[in-house]
Amino acid sequence: MPVNLYYTQRVRGFQQESVKYSKESVEIRLKRTKHQCPHCGSTSVTVEPIRSRRIRGEPLGSCRKVALEFTIHRLYCHSCHHREIEHIPFLSHPKARLTKALERTILELRPHISIQALANFYDLRWHTIKELEKKHLKKKYSRIQTAHIKAIGIDEIHIGKGMQNQQYLTIVRDLQSGAVIHVGDGKGISALAITCQF
């Protein structure tokens, strides 16, 4: 049984229409296999093509540039009368330019490789990888469960001279995870007023 190239990109719900090869790149054109309403699951939908998307996928062998092309559709459900732009399951958000699989690979390699080395290897912009890492860290540390905090560390740092006096920040961290719990202006007890509420 032949394995289609788009399976290596962890793409489901699409089929391969065409493939173009060159020395350093592969372009895979995809087509949705079945359209259904995301709310009621009905397949009785009207499909309206909106635009074509081109995103980057994981490298295949010596081909570092893998492009996936597909058309985004607007769906109208005849059962529940809901109108919505279709969800693409292999993208982390509607405006993503990389597949979830490539994003995951970059995030797994990032602790071991510099941003510039990853950008050079995948032929991406430095800012693309930096933004991906920032988004991941924000998601990871945005929801800190204060019930699980066993020990905190409080640090006051000098950030420079202001108009009339010295300026400080007070940083409160969870010592186990290293997550920042609170950043307060100034130093002393007044900078910790919000933190003490948990």
What name fits each language-model region?
Residues M1-H82, I88:
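Short, conserved DNA-binding cores of transcription-related domains
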Residues P2-Y7, V11-G13, T43-S44, I50-R54, ...:
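Short linear motifs at secondary-structure transitions and domain/linker junctions
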Residues T33, L91, G186-S190:
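A short, sequence-level motif marking secondary-structure junctions
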Residues P38-C40, R97, L192-T195:
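A short, polar/proline- and glycine-enriched secondary-structure boundary/capping micro-motif
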Residues T46-I50, H87, A96, T170-D174, ...:
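Short, low-complexity, polar/charged sequence segments that are solvent-exposed and flexible
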Residues S52-I55, R64, A101-E103, Q176-V180, ...:
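Glycine-rich loops and low-complexity Gly/Arg-rich segments
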Residues I55-I152, E156-M163:
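Short, positively charged, Gly/Tyr-enriched micro-motifs
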Residues K134-F198:
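RNase H-like nuclease fold core
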